[in-house]
Amino acid sequence: DNVTGGRLLDTTFSVRAAAGTAPIVAARYEFADASLRFLRIMPLLERAAGVGFLQDHQMIVSLDRGVVSAPQGGLVNAAGTSFVILDTRIKGGDGQVSLALDGSITALMSLLDVEPLRLISKAGQSVTLADGRGSVSGSLQFPLRKGVPPNQIKFDVAATLRDVRSQTLIKDRDLRASRLALAADNAGLQISGPVTLDGIAANGSWNQQFGAAGRGRSQVVADMALSQATLDTFKIALPPNTVSGAGRADITIDLVRGQAPAFKLTSALRGIGVAIPAIGWRKAQNAQGALTVEGSLGPIPRVDLLELSGGGLSAKGEIILNDQAALDQARFSQVRIGNWFNAPVILRGRGKGQPVGVLIGGGTIDLRGASFGANGGEAGPMSLSLDRLQITEGISLTDFSGDFTGRGGFAGEFTGLLNGGPAVRGTVAPQRGRSAIRVRSDDAGGVAAAAGLIKSATSGTLDLTLMPASGAGSFDGDVTIRGLRIGDAPTMAALLDAISVAGLLRQLDGQGLAFDEVDAKFRLTPSQVILTQASAVGPGLGISLDGIYTLASKQIDFQGVISPLYLLNGIGSFLTRKGEGLIGFNFNLTGSAASPSVSVNPLSAFTPGMFREIFRRPVPEVTE
């Protein structure tokens, strides 16, 4: 049944026998133009030529030439293939085929997929999984009897696949390779080597496990190039200008029959720059980082998890694409940047070529280290609803809400509660690569009290401007208050008592002292308020002040002049500072801001205002 034709050449046959022993049979023959079948499961081998041996209870047939007409894909060259019956004395013993096949990939795959092998079908693939050429080597071992079940066929096959092209291994993805290695045994099937996937270079393997555990599923594991082109190829839509440079990533793709391929990509981001311009963060290409992306590939990919760290940032979220596979939302449940940003962030797509919109709901931002506006480029709208916006040590806005744009820098309007107290409103504008702030309130006294400056202040309107100054987290401030009233204030009482102004003391204890105008200039740093010039004037009193307030310890070191009866005394103020009359008392306030030490120089009252400088130290200086 296994030989249907051919010619025998140079046949030799010998039998040796000795008394009491089984005869020893040996033979050698050559054959040509043969049509034969090595295996019942395989197609007929045609135009076969080779040599056969029978020796030492083994039969060996080796092909010098011959072709197999595969079920699909054309002819396969089988030259070099051999067949061995391992022990002719055992009926139904094992036979072994050593394969040497060359042909189209489709033809080779169809031979590996004949019943009962079904190696390719077991992998959930078609024999037309790829175009190209291939060479197969390896062995098959099986019992020589009819009806052998597949689990009794042992195989270990290797193949080299050349000029490979496939859109089947990974559905709808163009996979190409100049050379791939195939390995198959009873445990599973693997195809590995360098490839391009839709033009993206990768080096990896496709693995299929046989048996119930691997039925209908396989896996691709690869090391691949990572750049903006990679993201574009896989339709992973990130905000514009997110990725620059190029590096490597490890990717795993799980292929399950009837489902979109699921993937996981990880990278140390070496050589890759990553930026979120909308919140002022950037990782340089030479900086270390970490990226994890998990989701599924399909007409509209999904990114269920995106974790990013590096350059002081850690973020975790997901990406949602719209029906056109463009960015709808990038939702991050938590984003941390250094010690200045800790909040959830949503980035909203606004169409091709448009900067994303930003929604920050909850969390905290510390403007002392913020880099909003530092990029100075085009940016989309930003809406913030923060638990706290920290401006400097001891000064923050809670329940902060604002809407901003990034066009040319960070700018917009906001509302909030100063240190959880009085309501303020304001504007932010880009300045010197940072943010300038203007704050206004209809409760100047409440603002002064909430800031810890004057606990008993009430009424009045406030207009405060903070301009970025040299040094991180430093601002030059200018404040204007109109209509302020100060009630029970121990420090003020101590000053008035020291200069024996009984009427003003009674006024302080009653309805409070009125100050029509309060003006100040100062430098705000992360650790200090440096008051360079301040004045408060009202009908009964004028005050000038300068010095330093240390924020962390709440210690003060101020000096100034207090001028009673300012309505009359202030007539000569053009010769002095604002808030000082012709007659005034030099004073110093030192120690705790809550309960400072008060000292007054009574002799200064007899010194004309223009010469009063002899009783005071120089005004604190600030660098430009």
Where are these regions (language model features)?
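Flexible glycine-/small-residue-rich
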Residues: 101-103, 362, 441, 481-483, ...
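Extended Gly/Ser/Thr-rich low-complexity repeat segments
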Residues: 111-115, 453-455, 576
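Flexible beta-edge/linker motif
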Residues: 346-363, 469
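Solvent-exposed beta-strand/coil patches in large extracellular/periplasmic or lumenal scaffold regions
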Residues: 1-88, 119-210, 218, 248-323, ...
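Predominantly extracellular/luminal regions of secreted and cell-surface proteins
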Residues: 95-113, 486
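N-terminal accessory interaction module
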Residues: 331-347
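CBM-like, beta-strand-rich accessory domains located in the C-terminal region of large
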Residues: 108-123, 127, 215-221, 225-235, ...
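Surface-exposed, gly/pro-biased binding rims or lids
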Residues: 235, 239, 563-598
